[in-house]
């Protein structure tokens, strides 16, 4: 499995965000196992335990921009029960949150505010882009709307839709949990490699292409 390695680059230009450099590498734990099988397996178990705790206790930051935020908050109601994924503890401060959901239209005037809120979150932190407007600007191809929040934030999961249903948001949350379970992060600021390794996650569109091609009985709009 290929991983995307991100390291802090203090010499990067100020307009670059995040300040770091990225490259594609192999799984660092597999390399460690080849060097020393005992230490490699021990590090694998420790990473697995830490990632299990992180992905099953994701605290979201209570933040929204537009109509997609309404669908996001609907996922916290009893019929959907987001507590099944350990993400029901909504935080009012970014310093106490684990991930931020950019739900709605991001205007240029809001971009520096969102970036400041992201910087106030403690590591490790993740970002979910929810809705067409957050993903690519949506139907607002105008001067005042940012054409995708990944222009200034590192996005981990994209949830399509205008607006996405709460079930789509829950699926995006599960994809984020799957990604966190495969991450390789430093266990301490003084121990091990300080780079962040993220597994390459293929799009669901590509993964389900064969499944869509095999469908012959298409449902009518009234049945969807």
UniProtKB/Swiss-Prot annotation:
Residues 213-224 have a biased composition (Polar residues). Its EC number is 7.1.1.-. Residues 201-224 are annotated as: Disordered. Its main location: membrane. It comes from the Bacteria. GO terms for biological process: aerobic respiration; electron transport coupled proton transport. It is an enzyme of class 7 (translocase). It is found in: Cell inner membrane. Binds 1 [4Fe-4S] cluster. This is NADH-quinone oxidoreductase subunit B. It comes from Pseudomonas syringae pv. tomato (strain ATCC BAA-871 / DC3000).
